[in-house]
Amino acid sequence: LHSDHFQNFQNMMEGKTYGRRMMMKFVMDTSWFHPITTKEIESVKIHNGTTFIPEEKMKDASGNFLTNAHLYRLYIYHWLMGHEHISQQPRLIVRWLEQKEAGMPLEIYAFIIDSSLAPYEWQRSQIVEHIIESMGWFGLRLYQCPSAYDVTNSNVYLSNKPVTYRKEDM
């Protein structure tokens, strides 16, 4: 008797499924969320060759630009929809998860058509690299806990002088 469980990949390897599932989370630094600027829209055009949605649809009902996070999620969804190695069946999901103290996770749930290990990992890496690269076009950053390097190289200087919060009389 075998007491360990195992995963049967035979159907996937024989092409009887939609591909191999890819589910990833990218934790975004919410301090970088803001209404998208025209500079960021131009950056997307330069790097992508076009905007993925017309500029008039980048505004809400009152005429204000949508946030860069909202448009980034739409961009990633449309980019994956057009990706030749992503299956359009059974589902493609790009969504925000509940915000945590470390940031707001963007979850990607998709199926990569190439189910063999090496091609799957190659395509998955290409997708991750594009997702990370394109964040900068929208003025976004991944969240990262401060490291010792960040603390020692910050521009905040500590002083042993007492701080006075009183306003000086003029």
Where are these regions (language model features)?
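Soluble accessory domains appended to multi-pass membrane transport proteins
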Residues: 1-59, 70-73
